[in-house]
Design a protein with these regions (language model features):
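Generic hydrophobic secondary-structure signal
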Residues: 18-20, 30-32, 42, 182-192
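A broadly used, surface-exposed interaction patch
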Residues: 31-66
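Short, surface-exposed beta-strand-loop junctions and turns on beta-sheet-rich folds
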Residues: 24-29, 38, 198-200, 207-209
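N-terminal ordered "arm"
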Residues: 1-37
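Long, compositionally biased intrinsically disordered terminal regions
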Residues: 65-218
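Aromatic-enriched hydrophobic runs in primary sequence
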Residues: 19, 36-39, 50, 214-218
Length: 218
C-alpha cells in the first residue's frame, strides 16, 4: 500500500483473522498480510478496496481500522490462492542464503547492464536480462528468485524480533506466530511464508503468470 496508494487491495476473512492481498508493482506475485481481529465480525469480509483509502483508515494508536467502500478491482483480485490445502515443500534455504542469492542476482544484473553496448541499453534488453535472472529458481526448489526478491523488498525477510507485539501481522490461520520461513504449495500455487507476511504466485510454467484460477466475484 505504501508503494502504490492508487492500487487496489483485496480483503478477505473472518474470525479470528483478516487477510489483505495486494500486487506490488514490478513483481508478478501476490503479497499477503494477515492480522488478528480483536473481536469477531458480523459476517465474513471479502471485497476489493482502494489501497490508499485502506491505509488512511488505519488508526495505529487504537489498533483499529474502518472498512473502505468497495471498488472495481483489477483482474488479479479475482484470482486468489486457495485458503487451505497447503503443504510444506522441503529444500528451502535459510533467510541468509536467500538474501545472498538476491544480492548476487542484483549484482549480476547491474554488471550485465553496464556491459551492454550503448546502442543495446534499451528497456526491452534490460527486461530480457531481468526475466532471465529473476526466473531462475532458488536452490532445489521451484521458487523463482523474483519471489524471494519481492519478499525481501517488502520487508518480509527481515530478522524476527525476540518479542512480536500484539499489533504485528499475524500468520495465516493455522500457522503459529513464531512459524519459521517456509515454502508451501497447494495445487498450482507456491507461497513463501514468513512471520511478517507471505508472497504467493503460480508455479513456473503455468500459463499467464497469476493466471485464471479460482475466479471469484469481485
Amino acid at each position: 500500500m505504501h508503494q502504490d496508494r492508487s492500487a487496489a487491495g483485496r480483503r478477505g476473512g473472518g474470525a479470528p483473522a483478516l487477510a489483505v492481498f495486494g500486487r506490488p508493482p514490478s513483481f508478478d506475485i501476490l503479497a499477503i498480510r494477515t492480522v488478528r481481529l480483536a473481536a469477531p465480525v458480523a459476517m465474513p469480509l471479502d471485497l476489493t478496496v482502494s489501497a490508499g483509502e485502506l491505509l488512511e483508515s488505519v488508526d495505529e494508536a487504537s489498533a483499529e481500522a474502518t472498512v473502505p467502500g468497495p471498488v472495481t478491482g483489477p483482474p488479479w483480485a479475482g484470482v486468489l490462492p486457495p485458503r487451505g490445502g497447503w503443504r510444506q515443500v522441503p529444500g528451502l534455504p535459510g533467510p541468509e542464503v536467500m538474501g545472498a542469492a538476491v544480492a548476487a542476482a542484483v549484482a549480476e544484473f547491474r554488471a550485465r547492464d553496464e556491459a551492454l553496448p550503448v546502442q543495446h541499453r534499451t528497456r526491452s534488453e534490460r527486461d530480457r536480462i531481468g526475466r532471465e535472472i529473476w526466473s531462475r529458481t532458488l536452490g532445489d526448489t521451484e521458487l523463482p528468485l523474483r519471489a524471494v526478491h519481492a519478499a525481501q523488498s517488502l520487508g518480509f525477510l527481515r530478522p524476527v524480533r525476540a518479542a512480536v507485539p500484539a499489533a504485528a501481522p499475524a500468520p495465516l490461520p493455522g500457522a503459529p506466530a513464531s512459524a519459521p520461513v517456509a515454502l508451501l504449495a497447494a495445487g498450482t500455487w507456491l507461497r513463501l511464508r514468513t512471520p511478517y507476511g507471505s508472497v504467493a504466485m503460480r508455479r513456473p510454467g503455468v500459463t499467464g503468470g497469476l493466471g485464471a484460477l479460482q475466479v471469484r466475484p469481485v
